[in-house]
């Protein structure tokens, strides 16, 4: 297996650079097996190097590049494009363009990450707007793809059509589904429901049934079921759906922990159920599916949650490595041709 190099923005996120560097070590030790991966770590040496020195194995699998600037959480994308060209985020993305690395991951400012990536890397052929995409657990044992998760607050019908094609290709490459079932998120399943944009996207997808396994509309109540493999929506709705799903997972865990300590009987029942409940929660734990790909860019760019700890960031690294190994962009180009 050939070695691949992943660029890492060590300064992005609420807990950077500690969570980033420790997350890299966690990924290397627990998630990547023998994947033959090295890291190009971009950040401010005064903050990153003292942490990196704690992890001998990681140091042997990485190169550190000192960058003087940081893209801040409140930086506007236009400002980051003009004034943050020596930042860890910019330099990490630029390493893909120059061929030094094969993918990049950052927990930093989403708008800046998208803007800089589009500026430096451009988009794939026939793609107007990239979309943020991830695979989420369903009620069964399977996963489904959800996009857009926030790259585009408003989307045209043609953009939703492109998202559907890209999401289908992602499901084929990452989830190994031969003919992914694709649906548009809507307030009802009847063809007359929804906005003009959604109904126009419905018609475009219906006309492309030879290229895509389009199943019509899906309501929010059904997305965690096993009805479809790809759910398509605009970034406004998609981001809300994702955050509500994460909130439900943490709320369920909190409610269960309180209920099993309310009495002696419930404590005993909790002990009996603890192992299975822990297993079930881990599957729905947002940390386990952290890492969303910016689909449609001419390069592998993965956005990690801004509040990711080391475990969550490690899973974003795993997503990045898998996207590179699966040659996801080549498969999207094939689907769009």
Swiss-Prot record:
Q: In which pathway does it act?
A: Lipid metabolism; phospholipid metabolism
User: Where is it localised?
Assistant: Cytoplasm
EC numbers = 2.3.1.274
Q: Does the keyword Electron transport apply?
A: no
**InterPro entries in the record:** FA_synthesis, Phospholipid_synth_PlsX-like
The reaction(s) annotated as catalysed by this protein in its Swiss-Prot or TrEMBL entry are: a fatty acyl-[ACP] + phosphate = an acyl phosphate + holo-[ACP]
Single GO molecular-function term?
A: phosphate:acyl-[acyl carrier protein] acyltransferase activity
Q: Does the keyword Transferase apply?
A: yes
Q: Which GO terms describe its cellular component?
A: cytoplasm
Keyword annotations of the record:
Cytoplasm, Lipid biosynthesis, Lipid metabolism, Phospholipid biosynthesis, Phospholipid metabolism, Transferase
Query: Tell me, what is an example of a GO biological process annotation in this record?
Result: fatty acid biosynthetic process
Q: What is said about its interaction partners and assembly?
A: Homodimer. Probably interacts with PlsY.
State the family named in the UniProt similarity comment for this chain: Belongs to the PlsX family.
Describe the task this protein carries out: Catalyzes the reversible formation of acyl-phosphate (acyl-PO(4)) from acyl-[acyl-carrier-protein] (acyl-ACP). This enzyme utilizes acyl-ACP as fatty acyl donor, but not acyl-CoA.
Tell me the PANTHER family matching this sequence: FATTY ACID/PHOSPHOLIPID SYNTHESIS PROTEIN PLSX, PHOSPHATE ACYLTRANSFERASE
Name of the protein described by the UniProt record: Phosphate acyltransferase
Q: Which gene encodes it?
A: plsX
């Amino acid at each position: 297996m050939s070695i691949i190099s992943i660029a890492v923005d060590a300064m992005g996120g609420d807990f950077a650079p500690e969570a980033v560097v420790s997350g890299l070590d966690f990924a290397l030790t627990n998630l990547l097996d023998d994947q033959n991966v090295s890291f190009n770590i971009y950040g401010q040496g005064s903050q990153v190097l003292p942490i990196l020195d704690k992890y001998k194995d990681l140091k042997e699998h990485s190169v550190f590049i000192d960058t003087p600037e940081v893209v801040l959480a409140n930086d506007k994308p236009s400002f980051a494009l003009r004034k943050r060209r020596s930042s860890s985020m910019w330099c990490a993305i630029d390493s893909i363009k120059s061929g030094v690395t094969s993918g990049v991951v950052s927990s930093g400012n989403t708008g800046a990450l998208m803007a800089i990536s589009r500026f430096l890397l451009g988009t794939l052929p026939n793609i107007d707007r990239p979309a943020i995409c991830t695979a989420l657990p369903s009620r069964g044992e399977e996963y489904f793809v959800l996009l857009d998760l926030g790259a585009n607050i408003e989307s045209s019908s043609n953009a939703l059509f492109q998202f559907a094609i890209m999401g289908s290709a992602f499901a084929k490459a990452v989830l190994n589904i031969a003919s992914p079932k694709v649906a548009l998120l809507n307030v009802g399943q009847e063809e007359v429901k929804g906005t003009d944009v959604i109904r126009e996207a419905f018609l475009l997808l219906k006309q492309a049934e030879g290229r895509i396994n389009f199943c019509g509309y899906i309501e929010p109540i059904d997305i965690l079921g096993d009805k479809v493999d790809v759910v398509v929506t605009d970034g406004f709705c998609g981001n809300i759906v994702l955050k509500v799903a994460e909130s439900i997972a943490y709320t369920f865990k909190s409610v269960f922990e309180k209920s099993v300590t309310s009495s002696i009987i419930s404590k005993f029942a909790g002990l009996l159920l603890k192992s299975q409940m822990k297993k079930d929660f881990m599957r729905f734990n947002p940390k386990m599916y952290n890492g969303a790909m910016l689909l449609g860019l001419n390069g592998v760019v993965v956005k990690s949650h801004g509040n990711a700890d080391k475990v969550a960031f490690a899973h974003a690294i795993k997503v990045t490595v898998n996207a590179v190994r699966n040659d996801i962009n080549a498969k999207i180009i094939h689907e769009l041709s």
